[in-house]
């Protein structure tokens, strides 16, 4: 997500969601069983292929024509699954919001921040979830606290990550590991922070992402009809929520 390729490119949330849907659809078609699927250290991850994918996305942004879109689709079809995951991370890392903060001299400063899930929304939801006795509907309550466009993107990401976690016996991507790989992409990394502050933010974001993922999985398990087959591994993942 933090590659130097097109690092200054920013994506509108609706545009990012459209790319996320296309990329994850292709990953699903290829399968999510590959070991270290979400890892940037995966042996089969190709830097050159990832750069081509990123350039294809940028081309569709700068020249939104049918030809550019077709070229991007061709890149999707021929890329390996690890490069597609790298592209997914890049897309999520390009979502930014401008916020107003006060400096030490009380001067109002406009600051660019990454991540798309507001941290304060998450913490208030977490506190309310505890008061409500950890209802199986808690994920739905989180979605209702978010802007519609944010909720749509979070749903798309969680739907993909839940599939990945369900296949953790093959890809080794447990909910905890998923949280570590995607936490900063959901909540963003602090700007100009010390190592200790950045690491603390990483741990918080990782744990929060794992929490949301398990809440998502638990909600959908509770909504499944009695006759619907659910993988035993999925049931075990949410047993101790």
Where would I find each of the regions flagged by the language model?
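Short sequence/structural elements of tandem HEAT/ARM alpha-solenoid repeats
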Residues: 120, 155-156, 173-176
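C-terminal regulatory/linker segments that are acidic, Ser/Thr- and Pro-rich
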Residues: 1-11, 15, 19-21, 166-241
């Amino acid at each position: 997500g933090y590659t130097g390729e097109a690092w200054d490119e920013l994506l509108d949330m609706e545009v990012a969601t459209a790319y996320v849907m296309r990329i994850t659809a292709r990953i699903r078609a290829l399968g999510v069983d590959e070991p270290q699927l979400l890892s940037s250290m995966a042996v089969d991850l190709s830097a050159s292929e990832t750069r081509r994918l990123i350039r294809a996305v940028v081309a569709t942004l700068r020249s939104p024509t049918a030809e550019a879109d077709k070229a991007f689709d061709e890149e999707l079809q021929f890329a390996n699954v690890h490069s597609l995951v790298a592209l997914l991370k890049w897309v999520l890392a390009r979502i930014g919001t401008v916020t107003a903060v006060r400096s030490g001299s009380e001067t109002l400063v406009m600051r660019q921040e990454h991540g798309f899930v507001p941290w304060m929304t998450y913490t208030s939801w977490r506190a309310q979830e505890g008061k409500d006795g950890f209802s199986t509907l808690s994920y739905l309550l989180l979605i209702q606290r978010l802007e519609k466009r944010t909720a749509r993107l979070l749903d798309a990401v969680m739907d993909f990550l839940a599939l990945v976690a369900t296949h953790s016996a093959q890809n080794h991507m447990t909910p905890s590991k998923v949280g570590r790989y995607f936490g900063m992409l959901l909540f963003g990394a602090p700007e100009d922070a010390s190592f200790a502050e950045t690491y603390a933010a990483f741990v918080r974001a990782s744990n929060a992402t794992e929490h949301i993922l398990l809440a998502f999985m638990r909600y959908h398990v509770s909504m499944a009809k009695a006759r619907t087959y659910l993988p035993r591994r999925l049931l075990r993942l949410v047993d101790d929520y």
